[in-house]
Amino acid sequence: MQFMFAALKLELGDTLYYLLIFAALLLLVKHFAWGPVTKMMEERRQKVISDLDQAESDRKKAELLANQREAALKDSKQEATQILSTAKSNAEKTKNNIISQADQEAAAIRKRASEDAAQAKTDALNEARDQVADISVAIAEKVISKNLSAADQKDLVDQFIKGLND
Protein backbone atom coordinates (compact mmCIF):
# COMPACT_ATOMS: atom_id res chain seq x y z
CA MET A 1 0.00 0.00 0.00
CA GLN A 2 2.79 2.29 0.63
CA PHE A 3 3.79 1.61 -2.88
CA MET A 4 0.49 3.07 -4.07
CA PHE A 5 0.79 6.07 -1.88
CA ALA A 6 4.36 6.52 -2.98
CA ALA A 7 3.31 6.45 -6.59
CA LEU A 8 0.68 9.09 -5.90
CA LYS A 9 3.10 10.95 -3.67
CA LEU A 10 0.55 11.13 -0.88
CA GLU A 11 1.39 10.70 2.68
CA LEU A 12 -0.77 8.82 5.14
CA GLY A 13 -1.30 11.98 7.16
CA ASP A 14 -2.49 13.91 4.14
CA THR A 15 -4.87 11.13 3.29
CA LEU A 16 -6.34 11.10 6.78
CA TYR A 17 -6.64 14.88 6.68
CA TYR A 18 -8.52 14.70 3.36
CA LEU A 19 -10.82 12.00 4.71
CA LEU A 20 -11.58 14.07 7.81
CA ILE A 21 -12.31 17.16 5.71
CA PHE A 22 -14.52 15.08 3.42
CA ALA A 23 -16.44 13.63 6.40
CA ALA A 24 -16.83 17.12 7.89
CA LEU A 25 -18.12 18.44 4.58
CA LEU A 26 -20.58 15.55 4.38
CA LEU A 27 -21.85 16.37 7.89
CA LEU A 28 -22.18 20.05 7.03
CA VAL A 29 -23.97 19.26 3.77
CA LYS A 30 -26.26 16.84 5.58
CA HIS A 31 -26.99 19.32 8.34
CA PHE A 32 -27.42 22.50 6.26
CA ALA A 33 -28.20 21.47 2.67
CA TRP A 34 -29.63 17.95 2.72
CA GLY A 35 -32.87 18.91 4.54
CA PRO A 36 -33.76 21.85 2.26
CA VAL A 37 -32.73 19.88 -0.84
CA THR A 38 -34.84 16.86 0.14
CA LYS A 39 -37.68 19.18 1.16
CA MET A 40 -37.45 20.91 -2.22
CA MET A 41 -37.33 17.52 -3.98
CA GLU A 42 -40.36 16.31 -1.97
CA GLU A 43 -42.27 19.50 -2.78
CA ARG A 44 -41.39 19.06 -6.43
CA ARG A 45 -42.48 15.42 -6.29
CA GLN A 46 -45.78 16.43 -4.67
CA LYS A 47 -46.28 19.16 -7.30
CA VAL A 48 -45.63 16.69 -10.11
CA ILE A 49 -48.08 14.21 -8.54
CA SER A 50 -50.62 17.01 -8.09
CA ASP A 51 -50.13 18.17 -11.68
CA LEU A 52 -50.54 14.61 -12.94
CA ASP A 53 -53.70 14.14 -10.87
CA GLN A 54 -55.03 17.49 -12.11
CA ALA A 55 -54.20 16.56 -15.70
CA GLU A 56 -56.00 13.22 -15.28
CA SER A 57 -58.98 14.99 -13.73
CA ASP A 58 -59.00 17.56 -16.56
CA ARG A 59 -58.75 14.77 -19.13
CA LYS A 60 -61.70 12.95 -17.56
CA LYS A 61 -63.71 16.19 -17.46
CA ALA A 62 -62.86 16.90 -21.09
CA GLU A 63 -63.80 13.35 -22.05
CA LEU A 64 -67.09 13.64 -20.15
CA LEU A 65 -67.79 17.02 -21.76
CA ALA A 66 -66.97 15.61 -25.20
CA ASN A 67 -69.34 12.69 -24.57
CA GLN A 68 -72.06 15.09 -23.41
CA ARG A 69 -71.59 17.27 -26.48
CA GLU A 70 -71.65 14.22 -28.73
CA ALA A 71 -74.87 13.02 -27.07
CA ALA A 72 -76.37 16.51 -27.37
CA LEU A 73 -75.37 16.65 -31.03
CA LYS A 74 -76.90 13.23 -31.62
CA ASP A 75 -80.09 14.33 -29.83
CA SER A 76 -80.25 17.55 -31.82
CA LYS A 77 -79.78 15.61 -35.06
CA GLN A 78 -82.58 13.25 -34.01
CA GLU A 79 -84.77 16.20 -33.08
CA ALA A 80 -84.03 17.93 -36.38
CA THR A 81 -84.88 14.74 -38.26
CA GLN A 82 -88.12 14.43 -36.30
CA ILE A 83 -89.01 18.09 -36.93
CA LEU A 84 -88.28 17.66 -40.62
CA SER A 85 -90.39 14.50 -40.75
CA THR A 86 -93.26 16.24 -38.96
CA ALA A 87 -93.00 19.24 -41.28
CA LYS A 88 -93.07 16.96 -44.34
CA SER A 89 -96.07 15.09 -42.94
CA ASN A 90 -97.90 18.35 -42.19
CA ALA A 91 -97.06 19.70 -45.64
CA GLU A 92 -98.39 16.51 -47.25
CA LYS A 93 -101.62 16.74 -45.21
CA THR A 94 -102.00 20.41 -46.11
CA LYS A 95 -101.39 19.62 -49.78
CA ASN A 96 -103.99 16.86 -49.71
CA ASN A 97 -106.50 19.13 -47.94
CA ILE A 98 -105.94 21.91 -50.48
CA ILE A 99 -106.32 19.49 -53.38
CA SER A 100 -109.47 18.02 -51.83
CA GLN A 101 -110.96 21.48 -51.28
CA ALA A 102 -110.04 22.51 -54.82
CA ASP A 103 -111.68 19.35 -56.20
CA GLN A 104 -114.81 20.02 -54.15
CA GLU A 105 -114.93 23.65 -55.26
CA ALA A 106 -114.39 22.63 -58.90
CA ALA A 107 -117.20 20.06 -58.63
CA ALA A 108 -119.48 22.69 -57.08
CA ILE A 109 -118.59 25.17 -59.84
CA ARG A 110 -119.24 22.52 -62.52
CA LYS A 111 -122.56 21.65 -60.89
CA ARG A 112 -123.57 25.33 -60.70
CA ALA A 113 -122.47 25.87 -64.30
CA SER A 114 -124.47 22.81 -65.40
CA GLU A 115 -127.50 24.01 -63.45
CA ASP A 116 -127.09 27.53 -64.88
CA ALA A 117 -126.78 26.11 -68.40
CA ALA A 118 -129.86 23.93 -67.89
CA GLN A 119 -131.77 26.92 -66.52
CA ALA A 120 -130.61 29.09 -69.43
CA LYS A 121 -131.69 26.36 -71.85
CA THR A 122 -135.07 26.06 -70.15
CA ASP A 123 -135.47 29.84 -70.17
CA ALA A 124 -134.49 30.02 -73.84
CA LEU A 125 -136.93 27.22 -74.74
CA ASN A 126 -139.71 28.88 -72.76
CA GLU A 127 -138.96 32.21 -74.40
CA ALA A 128 -138.87 30.56 -77.84
CA ARG A 129 -142.22 28.86 -77.13
CA ASP A 130 -143.68 32.16 -76.02
CA GLN A 131 -142.34 33.87 -79.14
CA VAL A 132 -143.61 31.09 -81.41
CA ALA A 133 -146.99 31.31 -79.71
CA ASP A 134 -147.02 35.09 -80.09
CA ILE A 135 -145.98 34.79 -83.74
CA SER A 136 -148.64 32.17 -84.36
CA VAL A 137 -151.30 34.30 -82.74
CA ALA A 138 -150.17 37.37 -84.67
CA ILE A 139 -150.18 35.46 -87.94
CA ALA A 140 -153.56 33.95 -87.13
CA GLU A 141 -154.97 37.38 -86.34
CA LYS A 142 -153.73 38.81 -89.61
CA VAL A 143 -154.95 35.80 -91.53
CA ILE A 144 -158.33 36.00 -89.86
CA SER A 145 -158.62 39.75 -90.29
CA LYS A 146 -157.86 39.48 -94.01
CA ASN A 147 -159.29 37.03 -96.26
CA LEU A 148 -156.16 36.16 -98.08
CA SER A 149 -155.21 33.70 -100.69
CA ALA A 150 -152.58 31.06 -99.95
CA ALA A 151 -149.91 33.07 -101.76
CA ASP A 152 -150.86 36.20 -99.82
CA GLN A 153 -150.74 34.25 -96.57
CA LYS A 154 -147.26 32.94 -97.45
CA ASP A 155 -146.06 36.48 -98.25
CA LEU A 156 -147.56 37.74 -95.01
CA VAL A 157 -145.77 35.06 -92.97
CA ASP A 158 -142.47 35.75 -94.76
CA GLN A 159 -142.78 39.49 -94.10
CA PHE A 160 -143.56 38.85 -90.47
CA ILE A 161 -140.52 36.59 -90.11
CA LYS A 162 -138.35 39.21 -91.84
CA GLY A 163 -139.62 41.78 -89.37
CA LEU A 164 -138.60 39.55 -86.49
CA ASN A 165 -135.06 39.15 -87.82
CA ASP A 166 -134.60 42.90 -88.09
From Swiss-Prot:
InterPro entries: ATP_synth_b/b'su_bac/chlpt, ATP_synth_F0_bsu_bac, ATP_synthase_B_chain. The chain crosses the membrane at residues 15-37. F-type ATPases have 2 components, F(1) - the catalytic core - and F(0) - the membrane proton channel. F(1) has five subunits: alpha(3), beta(3), gamma(1), delta(1), epsilon(1). F(0) has three main subunits: a(1), b(2) and c(10-14). The alpha and beta chains form an alternating ring which encloses part of the gamma chain. F(1) is attached to F(0) by a central stalk formed by the gamma and epsilon chains, while a peripheral stalk is formed by the delta and b chains. Belongs to the ATPase B chain family. Pfam families: ATP-synt_B. Gene3D superfamilies: 6.10.250.1580. F(1)F(0) ATP synthase produces ATP from ADP in the presence of a proton or sodium gradient. F-type ATPases consist of two structural domains, F(1) containing the extramembraneous catalytic core and F(0) containing the membrane proton channel, linked together by a central stalk and a peripheral stalk. During catalysis, ATP synthesis in the catalytic domain of F(1) is coupled via a rotary mechanism of the central stalk subunits to proton translocation. Component of the F(0) channel, it forms part of the peripheral stalk, linking F(1) to F(0). One of its GO terms (cellular component) is proton-transporting ATP synthase complex. PANTHER family: ATP SYNTHASE SUBUNIT B, ATP SYNTHASE SUBUNIT B', CHLOROPLASTIC. The gene is atpF. It is found in: Cell membrane. This is ATP synthase subunit b. It is a single-pass membrane protein. GO terms for molecular function: proton-transporting ATP synthase activity, rotational mechanism; proton-transporting ATPase activity, rotational mechanism. Keywords: ATP synthesis, Cell membrane, CF(0), Hydrogen ion transport, Ion transport, Membrane, Transmembrane, Transmembrane helix, Transport. It comes from the Bacteria.
